[in-house]
Amino acid sequence: MAEFTPITIAYGDGIGPEIMDAVLYILRQAEARISLETIEVGEKLYKKHYTSGISEESWNVIQRTGIILKAPITTPQSGGYKSLNVTIRKTLQLFANIRPAVSFHPFTRTLHPNLNLTIIRENEEDLYSGIEYRQTHNMYESLKLISHTGCKKIIRYAFEYAVKNNRKKVTCLSKDNIMKFSDGIFHRVFNEIAKEYPQIDNEHYIIDIGTAKLATTPEIFDIIVTSNLYGDIISDVAAEISGSVGLAGSANIGQHYAMFEAVHGSAPDIAGKGIANPSGLLNAAIMMLVHIGQGDIASLIENAWKKTIEDGVHTFDIYSEHSSSKKVCTKEFAEEVIKRLGQLPMTLPKASYPLIVKKQESKIEYKIDTTEVKKLVGTDIFINIHVFSAHDIADKINKLDIGNFELKTISSKGLKLWPHDLRFEIISDHWCCRFMNKDGTEIKHLDIIILLQALSKANIDFIKVENLFEFDGVACYSLAQGE
């Protein structure tokens, strides 16, 4: 008797239940060797005051199966609710998000008939973590956290993926011309790891020009690896220019768990109308089948789906009088795919996946390197005070007894405003005061506490402390513009 793989099914919100029903119908008719356990997540849970959108019972099911097929969910835009997608990815340590973008020309509309690329997006870090604060009446903050180990994991995965899938080139996208540390470490790790794969071409673009090239000449790309937020944006660009965002599926891969989902959202504006395209979730299910070693079923379904597309049987989002023969609803599309099980596409590439998945050989060192000498050399203290001139702040602080510290600069939003020959007047209630040790010796935490006490006695409202470090004698903090 064939062994059945347990799968967690999440129907999601909006069009989620409709497209999930269609996909499961196809999986059953194709005799996929899976057993299903259903969980309730998303909007219904938010309304029950689960701020994460998921219950403990659902976590237990996911932990038991290890594999999730998830339809899109709706995250309330009001405050206090966290994205379920991000929560699942981070909790299960699904560090790699794989998003293929392929043209199905001439059967779907596209300006890029030769498009065939895969975006590999870091999935746990970056601004997308959603770590945010309101610090003053006027100022809000989002934290961009990038780790050395996180960069190594995703970039190593991208090159291993290229090798296993016979890809020729890996392109890195970052913004390290501006963000020297966070995006800088991503680019540096890319350069280091690329040297270990001489058979794979490598290149780097700044994210803005890279995105422009993706939108206009996507044919030049093969594999793109990038950080979380950039990857989220460019994968939608790639999916849209391929013909429709409704066609794209994605995989979220970790060491112990995996989640498969469509790229698109829950589309509540068309929910319940029966017109949604299930192809994105179906392609995600195909990726899932390959992942669990059922390449035969994955090939069977993908070939039937491609034959359906070739035959011009299209849902509303990709229907065209020039390339379509029949406009169908969600359920009808599933039935048309099922009719073609066992058939092969005539023009589009035929799918042929192995029965046994080749696990990626991990060469990643997860240990944090602590050999660099770390030295505390200063501190940035952010204060909330509503004045028009940094000179007024400097005059007040310089009258205080702040021990062995000296006030070096005052800036706002990264622009140095003191000391300066010109007295800039700006509207701000958020200032960064940089303090350094007068004699250059190492600072102790107690010194900073004494400094904060002096500010507190002067009724200066400090809202954040960011310590300044050298690693092996190299200053590892940014300078303000003009510093």
Swiss-Prot record:
Named cofactor requirement(s): Mg(2+); Mn(2+)
Listed SUPFAM superfamilies: Isocitrate/Isopropylmalate dehydrogenase-like (SSF53659)
Keyword Disulfide bond part of the UniProt annotation: no
Catalytic activity line of the entry: D-threo-isocitrate + NADP(+) = 2-oxoglutarate + CO2 + NADPH
Residues the record lists as binding D-threo-isocitrate: 83, 85, 89, 99, 121
Chain positions recorded as NADP(+) binding sites: 74, 264-270, 277
Family annotation (InterPro entries): IsoCit/isopropylmalate_DH_CS (IPR019818), Isocitrate_DH_bac-typ (IPR014273), Isocitrate_DH_TT1725_C (IPR040978), Isocitrate_DH_TT1725_C_sf (IPR046997), IsoPropMal-DH-like_dom (IPR024084)
SMART domains for the chain: Iso_dh
Critical for catalysis, annotated site positions: 128, 175
Keywords from the named record: Glyoxylate bypass, Magnesium, Manganese, Metal-binding, NADP, Oxidoreductase, Tricarboxylic acid cycle
Pfam families cross-referenced by the UniProt entry: Iso_dh, Isocitrate_DH_C_bact
Keyword Metal-binding among record annotations: yes
Co-factor binding details: Binds 1 Mg(2+) or Mn(2+) ion per subunit.
Assembly and binders: Homodimer.
Role summary: Catalyzes the oxidative decarboxylation of isocitrate to 2-oxoglutarate and carbon dioxide with the concomitant reduction of NADP(+).
Family: Belongs to the isocitrate and isopropylmalate dehydrogenases family.
Name of the featured protein: Isocitrate dehydrogenase [NADP]
Gene coding for it: icd
